Regions:
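Short, flexible loop/turn elements at secondary-structure junctions
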Residues: 100, 115-118, 133-135, 256, ...
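Generic recognition of cysteine residues
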Residues: 15, 131, 160-163, 254
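An acidic/polar, Gly/Ser/Thr-rich interaction patch typically located in mid-to-C-terminal regions
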Residues: 48-49, 53-85, 218-310
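Short solvent-exposed strand/turn elements
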Residues: 125-142, 294-310
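Assembly/oligomerization scaffold segments
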Residues: 1-129, 293-295
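Short beta-strand-centered interaction patches in the first periplasmic/extracellular domains
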Residues: 116, 121-138, 167-244
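Amphipathic, non-transmembrane alpha-helical segments in extracytoplasmic/periplasmic proteins
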Residues: 61-64, 71-79, 143-171, 188-212, ...
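Short beta-strands and strand-coil junctions in structured, solvent-facing domains, enriched
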Residues: 69-70, 103-104, 137-138, 203-209, ...
């Protein structure tokens, strides 16, 4: 495993921390898992886009510059399509963590796998990674029809749990849906894993949103935020600039390390645009992170919690 660590330097401010971790399956001389940490002399630029309106939408672009030839060659070699990598899954797991120097734990904002890698030409020695969420096996066929271990009738929660197990995810099932005890009269399991989440989204008569975020399959009523606190977003808590109206609600920009989840509740307060002051549910975000620059922000889209799906 290779861990790229970067911490900004400031005597007066709580320094930002940005970690990029590649699971390169390294081994030491004894055959044990090796863990390599590189210093902070290079630049890391990260752009992460999440949108729960589309099931396969979480992606990240990671640019690492100002690195020496040894590290550059090591990263490029790890993603070369050797014979064994074409026969096996040629995906290298990657995760991005952010936080502050004073925080004991960092927050993971992306987990996925490297899809493509490009090398920049000298003199700017660098590597650019394009990453996607960790659902590389979602096209695997799970059978030619419904399996014998899957009941053809039962609760919607059981169906969601089956889908989460097949995708290798943890199920987050909203407590309001638990209370409703939704029963599904009959269903057929799709042939490919990539069809599982769209299948769950097809139950619109229940006004349900189903999507993947991080390592979780989240099932919730469309008009309800995920369980958790409602975050106050204002000038004192980290809002950047002035929020604006959109066709579906609001867009606003804030510091990246505010732990807002997708479909989380936020309470926006703006002095310059008070007409937006209300509670929203987040629907998408773009993180822009720089280890040696000024960019450390997240741009959110959100809609009022009263919206429903017909």
């Amino acid at each position: 495993m290779t861990k790229l660590v970067s911490t900004t330097y400031s005597e007066n401010l709580d320094c930002r921390r940005l970690n990029v971790i590649f699971d390169l399956k390294e081994k030491d001389s004894n055959g044990n898992d090796a863990f390599t940490i590189f210093d902070e002399s290079f630049n890391i630029n990260v752009m992460i886009k999440k949108d729960h309106a589309v099931q396969i939408s979480t992606q990240a672009i990671i640019e690492i510059t100002n690195i020496d030839r040894e590290l550059r060659n090591k990263l490029l070699a790890a993603f070369s399509l050797y014979k064994e990598r074409t026969l096996q899954a040629p995906f290298v797991p990657v995760s991005v963590e952010i936080g502050r120097k004073s925080s004991q734990h960092l927050r993971r904002v992306f987990i996925g796998a490297v899809v493509t890698v490009d090398a920049s030409m000298p003199p700017d020695i660098g590597v650019r990674f394009t990453c996607a969420e960790s659902q590389n096996d979602r096209t695997i066929q799970i059978g030619t029809g419904p399996g014998t271990d899957i009941p053809q009738t039962g609760s919607f929660q059981d169906l969601c749990q089956y889908c989460a197990d097949q995708l290798g995810l943890e199920l987050v099932y909203h407590e309001e849906l638990v209370a409703q005890n939704i029963q599904v009269p009959s269903y057929n399991v799709p042939y490919a894993l990539s069809s599982l989440v769209p299948m769950l989204m097809s139950y619109n008569s229940f006004k349900i949103a189903a999507y993947i975020d991080d390592i979780y399959l989240i099932i919730r009523p469309f008009a309800n935020a995920v369980n958790g606190p409602i975050y106050d977003i204002n000038a004192e808590t980290g809002m950047i600039g002035i929020p604006s109206f959109t066709e579906s609600g609001v867009s606003f920009k804030c510091l990246a390390d505010i732990p807002i989840p997708i479909a989380g509740g936020v309470r926006v307060t703006s002095i310059r645009n008070p007409g937006l002051d209300t509670t929203y549910i987040t629907s998408g975000v773009v993180y822009r992170l720089e280890s040696r620059g000024n960019e450390w922000s997240s741009e959110w889209k959100a809609y009022p919690s009263v919206l429903t799906v017909d």
